[in-house]
Amino acid sequence: MSLLTYNFESEYLNNNHQITVILPDKKRGISPAEFYGSDKKYKVLWLLHGTYGDDTDWLRKTNIELYAAEKNLVVVCPSALNSNYSNWPSAMLGYNMYDYFTKELMPLVYGWLPVSDKREDNFIAGLSMGGRGTIKFAVNYPQLFAAAAVLSAVPVPFDELRPGHPCLIMDTANPRMVQTIENAGGFEAYANSEENVWALIDQLAPTEDLPRLMFACGHED
């Protein structure tokens, strides 16, 4: 496989941003002109890292390059800091990762790389924080993805986030969840936003719009 590292100034993140992309290699017996001049559009996996990670995690810590080669698949790995793949308009000059993903990153990849924008050719997956981002994008933009794999993560349990509810996820050991709710303008605003995955799943479940979903969690997760 070929490896592309691309660093660019993002309008939605208000800083330079880096992505890592795995691309199919030219097969032996095919001329460079034939391969690189082809109009072929490849299927793509949007692969999201977890907390404390970046765009290199999947490449350094897994065999994703081998799996991509087997499937002749493009893999796009963005870097999201510890943003929970949410918009943070009050952070620095604004760090709007949720909007960035669909409004900037995806158009960039479709426009500059040999990647199909058809729903049936687009897949999304992520680990831990990346899993939460995965399910959030999958249910808010079901028209964009054929399937989603949520690894070591589940949608946030909203009833347990209500003020006064005894919930481990709201413990002071997990300040990100508290900050995320404050960032949204409080619990009610948070519950009525794109973050409320449970409500969206309920709306989509009776329809044929929901992407195929896979959830997986290991014994040590």
Language model region names:
Residues M1-D221:
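Non-catalytic cap/lid and distal C-terminal segments of serine-dependent acyl enzymes
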